From Swiss-Prot:
GO terms for cellular component: cytoplasm. The keyword Nucleotide-binding applies. This is tRNA-specific 2-thiouridylase MnmA. It catalyses: S-sulfanyl-L-cysteinyl-[protein] + uridine(34) in tRNA + AH2 + ATP = 2-thiouridine(34) in tRNA + L-cysteinyl-[protein] + A + AMP + diphosphate + H(+). Residues 159-161 are annotated as: Interaction with tRNA. The active site is at C112, C209. The lineage of its organism: Bacteria, Pseudomonadati, Pseudomonadota, Alphaproteobacteria, Hyphomicrobiales.
Length: 382
């Protein structure tokens, strides 16, 4: 076996690297090239900020493509740019907009990985004769007895991206490789300088790639102008406290920007797209104990539909550490259900819930799903 757990010698093993134009994927290409693999770089043209926000000169995607091409030239590997804009708009951007309109808080990176990178790009890589598709994600995969592979949290806890990759299927894991899963970020940047890459000190992206300056409301208003309608801001006790310009400007758990002179700290508890109401209340009203999941991807050893109280750890936001919980299959609702050991605040439909075997820093990823419904207590979810 070679360093990628593949049977052929590196020089006989073709690896397609998904090159975003950032330091991480560029270093992956450099590492594999140095190890003697037949490396091919592919960059996806996914979006145009100008088209999304209706502003001229708003596109930064062109710079990323330029950076990826320059990295490939420095490393001496072939590089191709593929136009995936139409499929990205349909699978990710349109779904993102529709989710917000329905009062949800979507995580578009999960859908991009699921539909674009690990489905469409993976198929393209195989068409090019690739033995593996490598990415710059900070997550680890390791072989298991029997020949299958499992997904694990990355070595660098500050960079771990397993939350966004829970939807990776077992079949995809057989072909995917994540060389940075065992490296700290500072080592990645050191390698970039060693390889002579111009992106060695390029800042990490902080925003959703197709949302400039983090203003997702502008993107949604542009894509779905008829869906933005004003409504009332209502307290849980029934009082009308004010008005708003559209529920797309709010997320569950939000406190800032409510502009309510009530003298008490209030948080967004629920969004009602049917009535265009933003429901607010005290922080304790945000506590969630039970989460029902949709579109569940399961990587565990036991069949998901046979689980009835499996101890796990779950992550409901990328910035939070996994917390203890119990996983079961709700036969009446025909969905997976997570019961949190300790209630969590700010859990919203549309968010991702990643499931781990335990709370450890290198825990195995067991899958996850999209949060369909939340309940304040176990009794309410029964």
């Amino acid at each position: 076996m070679n360093s990628l757990d593949l049977p052929k010698a590196p020089q006989d093993t073709r690896v397609v690297v998904a090159m975003s134009g950032g330091v991480d994927s560029s270093v992956v290409a450099g590492l594999l090239k140095r190890q003697g693999y037949d490396v091919v770089g592919i960059t996806l043209q996914l979006y145009d900020h100008g088209a999304a926000t209706h502003r001229r000169g708003a596109c930064c995607a062109g710079q990323d493509i330029h950076d990826a091409r320059r990295a490939a030239e420095t490393l001496g590997i072939p590089h191709y740019v593929l136009d995936y804009e139409d499929r990205f708009r349909e699978a990710v951007i349109d779904r993102f907009a529709d989710s917000y309109i329905h009062g949800e808080t979507p995580i578009p990176c999960v859908e991009c990985n699921r539909s674009i990178k690990f489905r469409d790009l993976l198929a393209t890589a195989l068409d090019l004769g690739a033995d593996a598709l490598a990415t710059g994600h900070y997550v680890a995969s390791r072989p298991r007895p029997g020949g299958s592979r499992a997904l694990y949290r990355a070595l660098d806890p500050a960079r771990d991206q397993s939350y966004f990759l829970y939807a990776t299927t077992a079949e995809q894991l057989d072909v995917l490789r994540f060389p940075l899963g065992e490296l700290p970020k500072d080592e990645t940047r050191r390698l970039a300088r060693e390889f002579g890459l111009s992106v060695a000190d390029k800042p990490d992206s902080q925003d959703i790639c197709f949302v400039p300056q983090g203003r997702y409301q502008d993107v949604i208003a542009r894509l779905r102008p008829d869906s933005v309608r004003p409504g009332e801001i209502v307290h849980l006790d029934g009082r009308t406290l004010g008005r708003h310009d559209g529920i797309i400007g709010f997320t569950v758990g939000q406190r800032r920007g409510l502009k309510l002179a009530t003298g008490e700290p209030l948080y967004v508890v629920r969004l009602d797209p049917e009535t265009a109401r933003v429901v607010v209340g005290p922080r304790e009203a945000l506590a969630t104990s039970v989460i029902r999941l949709a579109e569940t991807n399961w990587l565990g050893d036991e069949p998901l539909t046979e689980l009835d109280g499996m101890p796990v750890a779950v992550r409901v936001r990328s910035t939070r550490e996994p917390r203890p919980a119990t996983l079961r299959w709700n036969r009446a609702a025909s969905c997976a259900e997570v019961m949190l050991a300790t209630p969590e605040d700010g859990v919203s439909p549309g968010q991702a819930c990643a499931i781990y075997a335990d709370e450890g820093p290198r825990a195995r990823v067991l899958g996850g799903g999209t949060i369909l419904r939340v309940e304040a207590s176990r009794r309410e979810a029964a």
